[in-house]
Amino acid sequence: MAHKKAGGSTRNGRDSESKRLGVKRFGGESVLAGNIIVRQRGTKFHAGVNVGVGRDHTLFALTDGKVKFEVKGPNNRKFISIEA
């Protein structure tokens, strides 16, 4: 008689859901107050003028205007500002 033994289980086959991080509004784009500009882990980008920081380091617009990316300071940090 043809028999097949039970197959062993695999230990792989899992993956976490993607977190959809990254820049949501790019330089020169118009934003409204409250719009999310960047979702990030840690402060890859720092908040500049008219930009707020959320509990999870999300950067968001505090006023209406255009997004501006700039590199400043001795450590070449990336700042995001809103030009009204």
UniProtKB/Swiss-Prot annotation:
Superkingdom, taxonomy of origin: Bacteria
Alphabetized UniProt keyword annotations: Ribonucleoprotein, Ribosomal protein
One Gene Ontology cellular component annotation held by this UniProt entry: cytosolic large ribosomal subunit
Gene3D superfamilies named among the record's database cross-references: 2.40.50.100
Molecular function as annotated in GO: structural constituent of ribosome
Region of interest: Disordered: 1-22
InterPro entries linked to this entry: Ribosomal_bL27, Ribosomal_bL27_CS
GO BP term, example: translation
HAMAP family assigned to the protein according to its UniProt record, in alphabetical order: Ribosomal_bL27 (MF_00539)
Protein family (similarity comment): Belongs to the bacterial ribosomal protein bL27 family.
Protein name, as recorded: Large ribosomal subunit protein bL27
Organism of this sequence: Shewanella sp. (strain MR-4)
Gene that encodes the chain: rpmA
